Amino acid sequence: MEIVGKKSQGLSITTLDEDKTVIVSFNDRSLNFYVTDSLKESLKQTINTKIDEGFVHFVLNLENVKIIDSCGVGLIIVANNVTASRDSKLYLCHIKPFIIKIFDIMRISKNLSIYDSEEDVLEAVKQS
């Protein structure tokens, strides 16, 4: 596992070479105004670097995220746009129900691939 950024406020990156999949976990419990500026650049750079290395599936594991604001939602939208523009796919997993409700209210759920667990995402990747 690779850590990008400060351990307490960064991203943990796990690569699954056989599936061409990158799992990105957020180390902080908050995706809000205070952390998203630094995370946005780290996340974009990580996605672009891994795409250049041949990876095509990206999983954002939100298991640790307990707080999210509009900046955090924007971070997820940026990740979705970066992967889509580079012919790759973004998946989200371990999302708290209140975050899904926020996505529903903002009407972005239909544009996101949301799964319950990493295992569910990996099964979907294998079937794609």
Predicted feature locations:
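Non-catalytic signal-transmission and effector/linker regions of two-component phosphorelay proteins
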Residues: 1-17, 126-128
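STAS-typified acidic loop motif
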Residues: 9-44
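Amphipathic alpha-helical interaction surfaces in cytosolic regulatory modules
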Residues: 31-112
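Short acidic-hydrophobic, aromatic-tinged amphipathic segments that line or gate anion-handling sites
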Residues: 113-117
